């Protein structure tokens, strides 16, 4: 299988993702410049964190119009896999591939921390390596990571089991105190109805290298790899 990592002016987590997919998982990976239009060779597209286009106008608002994102939208419409991390999550909501929006953190401060996150759904390629209700620890680093959705959209997210990750206490309890940024319902990550497009504010790629001492994020990438290999997708 082959991964592609989008690179916008201002991206700064693209190489972190490549380290995981190419160096840890040993999968072919190429970096996709924002002006590229042909990504037909890719099985999985990752939109990394950073400050695409300087976060001008709104986080992700300009990126959505890039040629590479237009190709990514077509990729997603074909049922292929797309992951947006942090700024990538913002790009996915701006492009309409995921519902809702990411707004300023509740306390209006940039947050950089490691937080417990509860896995809500495990029957998708992205989450199949986890256990339902499992609490994992992932880094966060964002200033506009507060997920918002209107009541009707939130109702649909819940009904369709589109909420994949929630901020929680170390014991898995969902509380206001465990919510670092004010996200509605403690939401840390969601998917589209089909389950092939995922957006999350925490950084799994920063919790993947054993050298760093914890690898909770690696299971997300390993789950995708196992799923596609089971379908017969090879390098």
UniProtKB/Swiss-Prot annotation:
Disulfide bond entries: none
Any single GO CC term annotated in Swiss-Prot or TrEMBL for this entry: cytoplasm
InterPro entries cross-referenced by the UniProt entry: Class_I_gatase-like (IPR029062), PRibForGlyAmidine_synth_PurQ (IPR010075)
Active-site positions on this chain: 86 (nucleophile), 203, 205
TM region positions: none
Listed GO biological process terms: 'de novo' IMP biosynthetic process
SMART domains associated with the record: GATase_5
Pfam families membership: GATase_5 (PF13507)
GO function terms (MF aspect): ATP binding; glutaminase activity; phosphoribosylformylglycinamidine synthase activity
CDD domains noted in UniProt: GATase1_FGAR_AT
Keywords: ATP-binding, Cytoplasm, Glutamine amidotransferase, Hydrolase, Ligase, Nucleotide-binding, Purine biosynthesis
UniProt superkingdom: Bacteria
Reactions accelerated catalytically: N(2)-formyl-N(1)-(5-phospho-beta-D-ribosyl)glycinamide + L-glutamine + ATP + H2O = 2-formamido-N(1)-(5-O-phospho-beta-D-ribosyl)acetamidine + L-glutamate + ADP + phosphate + H(+); L-glutamine + H2O = L-glutamate + NH4(+)
Family matches, as NCBIfam families: FGAM_synth_I, PRK03619.1
Main function: Part of the phosphoribosylformylglycinamidine synthase complex involved in the purines biosynthetic pathway. Catalyzes the ATP-dependent conversion of formylglycinamide ribonucleotide (FGAR) and glutamine to yield formylglycinamidine ribonucleotide (FGAM) and glutamate. The FGAM synthase complex is composed of three subunits. PurQ produces an ammonia molecule by converting glutamine to glutamate. PurL transfers the ammonia molecule to FGAR to form FGAM in an ATP-dependent manner.
Subunit structure: Part of the FGAM synthase complex composed of 1 PurL, 1 PurQ and 2 PurS subunits.
Name of the protein in question: Phosphoribosylformylglycinamidine synthase subunit PurQ
Organism, as annotated: Acaryochloris marina (strain MBIC 11017)
């Amino acid at each position: 299988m082959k991964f592609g990592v989008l690179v916008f002016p201002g991206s700064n987590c693209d190489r972190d993702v490549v380290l995981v997919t190419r160096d840890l998982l040993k999968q072919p990976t190429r970096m996709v410049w924002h002006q590229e239009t042909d990504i037909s060779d890719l099985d999985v597209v990752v939109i990394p964190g950073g400050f695409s286009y300087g976060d001008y106008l709104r986080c992700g608002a300009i990126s959505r119009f890039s040629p590479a994102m237009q190709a990514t939208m077509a990729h997603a419409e074909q049922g292929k896999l797309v992951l947006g991390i942090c700024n990538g999550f913002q790009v996915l909501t701006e492009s309409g591939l995921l519902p809702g929006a990411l707004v300023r953190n509740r306390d209006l401060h940039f947050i950089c921390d490691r937080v417990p996150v509860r896995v809500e759904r495990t029957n998708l390629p992205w989450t199949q390596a986890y256990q339902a209700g499992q609490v994992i620890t992932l880094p966060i680093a964002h200033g506009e990571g507060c997920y918002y959705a209107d009541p009707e959209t939130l109702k649909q997210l819940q009904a369709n089991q589109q909420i994949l990750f929630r901020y929680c206490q170390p014991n898995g309890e969902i509380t206001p105190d465990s919510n670092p940024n004010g996200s509605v319902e403690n939401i840390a990550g969601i998917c589209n109805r089909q389950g092939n497009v995922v957006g999350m504010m925490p950084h799994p790629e920063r919790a993947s290298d054993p050298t760093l001492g914890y690898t909770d994020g690696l299971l997300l990438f390993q789950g995708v790899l196992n799923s596609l290999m089971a379908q017969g997708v090879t390098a």
